[in-house]
Amino acid sequence: MKHNLIYGIILAIATLTATELSAQSSEGCDLHRTRLIPYPTANEAVEHSLAKQRYMQPITEWVTDSEGLLTGEFTYPFSWVERQIFVRVEGVGVPYEVLVNGKVAGSSTNGHAAAEYNITKISREDKNSLAIRLLDSGSVAPIENFEKGDAHPVAYVLSQPRVRVRDIFYRATIGKSGIVNVDLGAIMHNQTLGTKISRLYYEVYLNDTIRLGAGHRDVSLGMHGVDTMRFGVPVPDSVLWSSESPTRLSLRLKNRIAGRDVEFYNVPLALRELSYENGTFYINGKATTMDWAEVSPNATADIVKSLYERGHRAIRFTAGYVADETLSACDELGIYVAVTAPINSSKMGTSRKRGGNPSNNPRWRAEYVERVEQMIYTTQRHPSVVAYYLADDSANGICLYEAYLAAKRISGNRPVFYEDGNGEWNSDK
């Protein structure tokens, strides 16, 4: 009933002459990343729960009003003093604003991907209100002609130290004699006015019991400095991930600043070497045929499991929002995935002239590019994701050209496709 009420409000909001966002990307967002939850202890990190804990408070229950304002509450404890506070928003489904204690933290024109906002300066000790204002979707309607499910907005309020792990990445390269070289990296961010040194401890585990590698690295960061801490771990090729053997590892991190342990992580890893050459995918050096089954982005983890049981091993999610839990299910099962940015302008025709399809209108360029980049950054740690699609049925033009170039800069070894572009250059097929 609660979700139906929220969805009803969203549909009503779309017909109102309400506050309208210009379709020119978002404001106030922190850099996009795949979901990353800090924990206060190593044991809690290993449990990897999304339940409330000292450094994270989920908001899943909302008080709604008829004007499209969803309001929740979080507590700012004393232990968060001298730390940064972020809110990660997922699954809204329409353009929205984020407000903390009545002050705007930021906004997004793309309600179909996760976004984070730094709310440190507008939060206060003790009780705080957090609101999501649903905005008129008319501004983005020309590029959102795709299936939308019920809205399930979730907000995670996160506390991180002022010298923090901003993101994590990894890459596997098959070497000689059955050894795989794993390149791990943590992007560190100093959000203080002085130079700080972080010591980052790392461990790589198989089945949470067999330690494959461990060590630590130090990095000195100047005022507001950002640097990447890299470390390598050799592992046997028997732990490589594939559809036939979806082996998963875990990366455990501990961030120590001035002798104090300030955040812990337990990040799922799945190692596979990916390449795409002359129309063929190679997984761990083996040519792999992708017999894509087109699936709604609203598919749940249970639907994915059902597809797996029916023999599907490659899924192409059409344009829209794919929940992190759904992609995690694909990781666990060994399903290859292609995700599509939330862009479909099929109702706007194919003309490239003024007033035609938005894909050739420079006014939409920033929106297209951000949606594609956001898709990549928020899914890139999922090993199941082996390809990206720019859009569905959206003609072609300058916006998709620029989106393709942006995607190629950050997609790594994953190919970028666009099948509806009449064979133009902005597709790896």
Residue map of PLM features:
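Coil residues (strongly favoring Ser/Thr
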Residues: 66, 137, 208-209, 227-228, ...
